């Protein structure tokens, strides 16, 4: 929109162009010791334009007399004199003058915020808003209306005034929706107010910029709702933002992909696996738009190529980790549905769920078609193709679980390529723990006890070397996690071997030796975990910390059980093992007596410990009597 095509007006437009160039381009080159040099120059130009506008306005209105001093047309905070006491239509001459002044106030506000002068920036933005609020909303000012409220929303969110930010942003959202319903024509962009006649933006570009402003509104609202702990609403707005960014091609591939992968993790917590899978498939496809990963040779020759290689490898590995979590949680949620009260597969429940699933599949597909789907014509097929490689339904039998496991395992391999032990210790171990968890939950679906035991052996093989090599002084928490998991894994293997042995009339020497090895290994790691809680003087804590209370007491309880399970034909050894077992059971009982608040944490273990404390002495005495009579 051009006021006229005079030389004076062209000079104003050129100043505005220079101000934009200084602010958006030249400012990136400013030295560290003067980081806002270009921003300040841009501000001066904007102030000069304000003076020129007042001068043009006076001339256009034919006001005689001495030319008013342009500085007197502003208050101390830069607010123009209030010459608008009634409502104007947005497309009237007065409305356009107000909008043009408001655009300057908007840019001055943003300029002050970018130079960390937040209060001054807020004042300019409020002046901008007051100017356009005097006018009816039309295509001439609707874009500015949304822009200024977006900025005020960001400003107040940065001050942790989340509700205030919410108010500005929700009004911006409503204004967009109302405008699109009642008018819908491409509105003027802020730049259109300061271009010579004939150089206005194209209709297509106006639409693109207007839609981008609204996309920003949705993005900021997603952050606001997240801060207000309205997580479902935040997810909806995040999903809409991502969808619009693709639709209008307003995205950086890696950033978009990471945001989509992050959103998938929210859907996983809500067991909405169809949406989670869609987000992850889209993330993987869009991440590939960032280009090929430069070779190691290219990375060595060029710093830019090295940085690109690092970023691409890292982001793709992060997306792979999100896929791992998807597969793992899908399997674990299925396990929760299918297990009985002792953690085994409930066959009746399995049949019931299979029947129910057949009836639900058709309804789910209908729901899927009404969901917001990502992708444009050139990416949608790729996204759908990737989705088809892994189910979004809870697996109900081994083969279904195995196919999900294999997908998860392939992403484990991909994630470990970047998050290697050398340089990414914590991340690498977390990935290994997820890999172990995948084997653990797959074993639940396996009916053959020997094969199930082999799956747990794979867990031991991947975790044990790490546990041995890791320095507990620097990685105490991780060491404890690994020790406890290894102890549990050997414990599960022991239970499986016990179940296999029970089917035999008389277990052979090899089976007994293997069984005792599993018991001893489990005890070793439980004891390492317990020892890690001791003081430097070797003293066990009188009172366990909350996060250690249940694990430590469970470890003691299981050590007690393991001692009692050791197989030996030597009566003296049997008595020694039972005495050690009794000692550990006694510890659990005594600790809970001295710390009553601990009882709720280990109700089942405490009940069994109390029972064994009364039974084991009888058994020990019988063995002692037998030994005495045999002498």
UniProtKB/Swiss-Prot annotation:
Residues 60-88 are annotated as: Disordered. Residues 60-70 have a biased composition (Acidic residues). One of its GO terms (biological process) is nervous system development. It is found in: Cytoplasm, Cytoskeleton. At 30 hpf, primarily expressed in central and peripheral neurons. Its main location: cytoplasm. GO terms for cellular component: cytoskeleton; mitochondrion. Belongs to the KIF-binding protein family. This is KIF-binding protein. It comes from Danio rerio (Zebrafish).
């Amino acid at each position: 929109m051009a006021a006229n095509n005079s030389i004076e007006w062209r000079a104003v437009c050129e100043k505005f162009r220079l101000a934009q160039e200084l602010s958006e381009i030249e400012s990136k080159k400013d030295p560290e010791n003067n980081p806002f040099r270009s921003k300040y120059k841009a501000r001066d130009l904007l102030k000069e334009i304000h003076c020129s506008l007042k001068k043009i306005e006076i001339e256009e209105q034919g006001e005689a007399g001495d030319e008013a001093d342009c500085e007197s047309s502003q208050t101390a905070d830069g607010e123009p004199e209030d010459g608008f006491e009634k409502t104007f239509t947005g497309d009237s001459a007065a409305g356009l003058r107000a909008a043009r002044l408001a655009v300057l106030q908007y840019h001055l506000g943003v300029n002050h915020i970018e130079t960390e002068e937040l209060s001054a920036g807020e004042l300019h933005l409020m002046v901008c808003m007051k100017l356009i609020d005097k006018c009816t909303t039309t295509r001439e000012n609707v874009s500015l209306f949304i822009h200024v409220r977006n900025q005020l929303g960001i400003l107040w969110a940065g001050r942790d005034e989340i509700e205030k930010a919410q108010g500005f942003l929700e009004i911006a959202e409503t204004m967009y929706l109302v405008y699109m319903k009642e008018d819908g024509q491409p509105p003027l962009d802020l730049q259109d107010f300061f271009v010579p006649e004939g150089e206005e933006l194209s209709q297509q570009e106006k639409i693109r910029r207007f839609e981008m402003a609204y996309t920003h509104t949705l993005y900021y609202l997603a952050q606001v709702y997240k801060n207000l702990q309205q997580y479902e609403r935040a997810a909806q707005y995040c999903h809409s933002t991502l969808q619009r960014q693709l639709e209008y091609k307003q995205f950086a591939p890696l950033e978009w992909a990471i945001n989509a992968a992050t959103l998938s993790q929210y859907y996983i917590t809500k067991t909405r696996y169809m949406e989670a899978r869609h987000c992850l498939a889209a993330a993987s496809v869009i991440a590939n738009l960032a280009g090929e990963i430069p070779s190691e040779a290219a990375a060595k020759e060029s710093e830019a190529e090295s940085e690109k290689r690092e970023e691409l490898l890292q982001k793709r590995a992060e997306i792979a980790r999100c896929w791992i979590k998807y597969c793992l949680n899908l399997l674990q949620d299925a396990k929760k549905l299918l297990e009985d009260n002792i953690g085994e597969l409930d066959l009746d429940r399995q049949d019931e769920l299979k029947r129910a699933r057949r009836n639900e599949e058709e309804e789910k597909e209908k729901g899927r078609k009404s969901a917001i789907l990502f992708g444009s014509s050139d990416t949608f097929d790729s996204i759908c193709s990737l989705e088809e490689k892994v189910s979004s339904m809870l697996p109900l039998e081994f083969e279904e679980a195995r196919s999900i496991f294999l997908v998860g395992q392939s992403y484990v391999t991909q994630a470990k390529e970047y998050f290697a032990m050398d340089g990414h210790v914590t991340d690498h171990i977390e990935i290994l723990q997820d890999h172990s968890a995948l084997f653990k939950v797959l074993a639940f679906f396996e009916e053959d006890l020997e094969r199930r035991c082999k799956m747990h052996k794979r867990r031991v093989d991947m975790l044990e070397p790490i546990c041995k090599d890791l320095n507990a002084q620097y990685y105490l928490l991780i060491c404890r996690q690994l020790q406890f998991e290894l102890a549990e894994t050997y414990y599960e293997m022991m239970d499986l071997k016990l179940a296999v042995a029970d089917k035999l009339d008389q277990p052979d020497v090899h089976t007994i030796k293997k069984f005792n090895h599993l018991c001893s290994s489990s005890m070793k790691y439980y004891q390492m975990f317990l020892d890690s809680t001791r003081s430097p003087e070797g003293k066990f804590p009188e009172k366990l910390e909350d996060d250690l209370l249940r694990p430590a007491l469970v470890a003691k309880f299981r050590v007690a059980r393991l001692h009692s399970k050791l197989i030996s034909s030597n009566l003296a050894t049997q008595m020694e093992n039972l005495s050690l077992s009794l000692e550990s059971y006694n510890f659990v009982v005594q600790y809970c007596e001295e710390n009553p608040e601990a009882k709720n944490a280990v109700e089942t273990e405490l009940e069994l410990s109390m029972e064994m404390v009364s039974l084991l002495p009888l058994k020990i005495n019988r063995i002692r009597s037998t030994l005495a009579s045999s002498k």
